[in-house]
Amino acid sequence: MKKIALALIAILIAVGTASARKVTGTVTSGEEKLGGVVVTDGKNFTQTKKSGKFAFNIEDDAEFVYILTPSGYVADYSSGVPAFYQSAEGRSKFSFDLIKTGEGNDYHLVAIGDAQIKNDEHFAIFEGEPIDDMAALGKTFTKPAAGLVLGDICWDELQYFKKYKKEIVRTGFPVYPVLGNHDNERNASGDHNGSATYRKEMGPENYAFFMGKDVVLVLDNIIYSTKRKYVEGYAEHVLDWVKNVMKFIPQNADIYVAQHSMLKLWPINQLIKDSDKLLDIIRGHKVLFLTGHSHICNNMEIEENVVEHNVAAICGTWWDTYYCNDGTPRGYKVYTKEAGKLEWYYKSVGKDKDYQVELYMPGQSVMHPNSIVLNIWDYDPQWKVEWYEDGKPMGKMDQVIDISPVYIREMYKAFEGRIDALNKKAYKYPRLNTHCLVATPSQYAKNVTVAVESPFGKKWVYNVDMSDYVDVQAHRGGMGLMPENTLESMKNALDLGVNTLELDLQISKDGKVVVSHDAYFHYRYATRPDGTPVNKGDAKEYIYTLNYEDIARYDVGSKANPDWPERACLATRKPLLDELIDFVENYTKEKGYSPVRYNIEIKTREGNGEGIYWPIYHDFVDACAKVLLSKHLDDRLVVQCFDPRALNFMHEKYPELHLSYLVDAKAGDFDKYMAKLKFQPEWLSPHYSIVDEALVAKCREKGMKMVPWTVDNPADLQRMIDLKVEAIITNYPDRLLMLTRGYAAPAPGPIVMRTH
């Protein structure tokens, strides 16, 4: 029995060694013999002796023998890829002769996101300004330097590997490649076969090199199947490789992990497959993951001492635009380790290294139209961003989710204004980001100062003139687009990113405050509860004569009207004021929008019907004010009215309200209509036809803001803008937004993770 067991052991040993073969070699730098250098075939590992020599068994089917390039040295990179590897096929001897780059622990590291080259047009852009920019940067380096291109070098068209290698040499520093999903053979089957062309042109998928006392692990975290199908994660052989490499990593070394896919998939905040296993292997070191794949910029803390920098794409949005679709400029990230301290910045192509912040004026952001927005694409919590309103410290700016107005305008231009054309290429649609911060000043603020300080002491100060934008007010929620004064119209206006919702109030028989312009159900929009249309000439059915329960049964949205051909037709009702404000406030919070403003008209008027078809003005005001003040809207609320009696009453009884005086086209002399008031309101709201330079000047002289109504024609809208009025009321907020911000795209829907 013992003899049989020994025979079986002998057979197993023979089988285990049959696939291995012995190789030898040297690692030198000129005449210098380099000892302690790690050598591997990807499975088996050894180190050179003091003589620089090594000998070990490699797998018989090993594709490469390669080294973990030691600190202070680099393999020749004149081919476009550092020659730290050699083909193992048919060879038993290997010689690696390295170039000495310097001594010490200081260095530069450059991280380059997806180049994604698909055609000659893409390549022509890539070899131009981006390469020139990196080459100019390389000339400024005073320490050993290396670059990493973080995958998706190509966009399935792998013949561009050769052209890429020829051009990347011009940077003047070695650039190490990472395998991306688009660097695989599109129609190959299996992970290993998929990367065959990549390995032929670029070398091993998993390797490492030292910089100073630190180490860079380059990993393939795309588990490829076929035809662009893949899983982001770590295959078992990759984890085994890392386990073996970690045996040679000093305990005091910081680790960079360079890989294509993000470690954490934002915004679902899910770690990729077997991340826990990888983190277990490398835990105990300070770790920085450098990743691409998403084409956006995102800095995330994974756990204590583990951070991920998801680097935006050097191709912008697939070479269509300068900006990535999260609003990060085309660029790359630069790291410098000096005296044990790591600093970094994002380098935008063609921009100075201090170009780190963009400021958007109020009205520019679709999600935060009443805010000053800072886009700090390299933002993390170490940045210090504070703001001041008219000299008063207001504290820190709030980090928010936003989309870039600059990118949207670029895409409008690229797609000739046809934003719907992006539906065919949804991966190019504007992306939500987390690197924007907002300050939301009072609409009566005159100046805002923003002070920014990077984690490394760089400072920026911005002074913002708050008169330098137009407040876009959606008349009845934008009645040219949606049924007027409804929840649907307000929602649409919010999604368009208006500054202010304009609406009107009436009172029901049972004392409820109803959102309605007309005192009765108008024939242009109303259908009775029994399904019969309200027609012109029918007896008027007044709001004040009906209980709200009955009012709510009327359909005020289904009926088409040739005067409003762009308006959507849908069944809806007149809401209560209380209901509408609650809906708006909850919806803005749910969507992550900054708070909206309200310009609300109380529809009092003198006439024979007062007290019969609508309340007496002071009762009307009291009912409305009770609801409005209960909502604590503060300076976000303006109450407007044509009726001087009601305005005088509000000013005396409710001094906390901000008031606007509405005047029509026949108002006549300024001094005469202003004399009807016992006070000076904060706002004057004239019909746009009587607005001219003289009227604007009078308002300026009196210290009143101006909000003309109701302006729909693009030429009239532009005239109001040119007169520099503070706000404009319009039935078509999309038309006005095209003039004030250059786009009228709605805010995006649910957050979706997109990679490509």
Regions found by a protein language model. Name each.
Residues 21-24, 28-43, 60-61:
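Short, ordered, surface-exposed loop/turn motifs in non-cytosolic proteins
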Residues 22, 29-30, 71-161:
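N-terminal active-site segment of His-dependent metallophosphoesterases
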Residues 43-57:
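Short, acidic Ser/Thr/Gly-rich low-complexity loop/linker segments typical of extracellular
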Residues 60-75:
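A short, solvent-exposed beta-strand micro-motif common in secreted/extracellular proteins
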Residues 74-75, 158-251, 272-290, 299-338:
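Extended active-site neighborhood of metal-dependent phosphoesterases/phosphodiesterases
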Residues 306-392, 429-443, 447-459:
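Binuclear metal-dependent phosphoesterase catalytic core
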Residues 374, 464-756:
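Phosphate-group recognition and catalysis centered on beta-loop-alpha active-site segments
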Residues 404-438:
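Aromatic sugar-binding surface patches on proteins
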